């Protein structure tokens, strides 16, 4: 089995694959101080609950946007699974797609991995991948899978946190889809929720429209990321929602590498 690990700024996702089949997935808060031993205690318990044994894992692949978290995850792979982890974007792992931007070395591993996964599900078409996480990214992927650039915007939670941090009398609230379509709130909390949620929807609508106009070709819009389901009721925004896009991209990246050996 393959253990795929995707470390984001907020959460780290772990998944088991057999071939192309996603068997199980788990999530833990990102903490670059967490040791290999701590990871294993947590992961071993969850694997056992779902009927898997760590001895069945024969490969590990990691994508991370938190460089300081990498060492302990590599140690996890070596110490507890007896393998050297492959790291997305580092030798001997090659992307297998072109990064057609001015600074290809600056493209986040998660965005390149998402491009690989999007190409697997929508080959031969122009794609717009929107990843809702700590930051929200919108990326144009060409018909051949090439990464062609994109946008980075503050994530919806980050926007809410900035509002609360800057305005002393505003309460801390959880982001969720408003209970109604009304955009006139009658409490402070509802007004905040309306402003952040519907303001964010308007931003995404506007950015999609601008990207479509500039690209000038039909686009398949794919949503992913930990907060993508927050906007699932806004069906007009996306053609498909793929919560596991990055994990599946790691699986495809590993499998295409194996074919070259």
UniProtKB/Swiss-Prot annotation:
Instruction: List GO molecular-function terms, semicolon-separated.
Output: ATP binding; pantothenate kinase activity
Q: Where is the active site?
A: 110 (proton acceptor)
State its cofactor. NH4(+); K(+)
Instruction: Name the residues that span the membrane.
Output: none
Q: Report residues binding substrate.
A: 108-111, 188
Q: Where in the cell is it found?
A: Cytoplasm
Kinase among keywords: yes
A cellular component term from Gene Ontology for this protein is: cytoplasm
Q: Output the Gene3D superfamilies linked to this UniProt entry.
A: 3.30.420.40
Top-rank taxon: Bacteria
Main subcellular location: cytoplasm
Q: EC?
A: 2.7.1.33
Q: Does the record's keyword annotation contain Kinase?
A: yes
Q: How does it assemble?
A: Homodimer.
Physiological role: Catalyzes the phosphorylation of pantothenate (Pan), the first step in CoA biosynthesis.
Protein name per UniProt: Type III pantothenate kinase
């Amino acid at each position: 089995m393959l253990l795929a690990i995707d470390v984001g700024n907020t959460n780290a996702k772990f998944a088991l694959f057999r071939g192309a089949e996603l068997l199980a997935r788990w999530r833990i808060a990102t903490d670059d101080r967490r040791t290999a031993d701590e990871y294993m205690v947590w992961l071993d318990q969850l694997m056992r609950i779902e009927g898997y044994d760590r001895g069945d894992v024969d490969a590990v692949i990691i994508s991370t946007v938190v460089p300081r978290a990498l060492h302990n995850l590599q140690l996890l792979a070596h110490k507890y699974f007896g393998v050297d982890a492959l790291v997305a974007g580092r030798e001997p792992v090659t992307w297998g797609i072109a990064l057609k931007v001015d600074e290809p070395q600056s493209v986040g591993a998660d965005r390149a991995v998402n491009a690989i996964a999007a190409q697997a599900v929508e080959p031969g078409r122009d794609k717009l991948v929107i990843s809702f996480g700590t930051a929200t990214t919108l990326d144009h992927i060409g018909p051949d899978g090439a990464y062609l650039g994109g946008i980075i915007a503050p994530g919806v939670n980050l926007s809410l946190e900035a509002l609360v941090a800057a305005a002393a009398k505003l309460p801390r609230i959880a982001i969720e889809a408003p209970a109604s379509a009304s955009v006139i709130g009658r409490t402070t909390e509802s007004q905040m929720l309306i402003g952040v949620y519907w303001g964010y929807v308007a931003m995404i609508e506007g950015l999609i429209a601008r990207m479509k106009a500039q690209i000038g070709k039909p686009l398949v819009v794919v949503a992913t990321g930990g907060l993508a389901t927050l906007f699932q009721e806004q069906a007009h925004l996306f053609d498909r929602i793929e919560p596991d896009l990055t994990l599946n991209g790691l699986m495809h990246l590993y499998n295409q590498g194996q074919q070259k050996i």
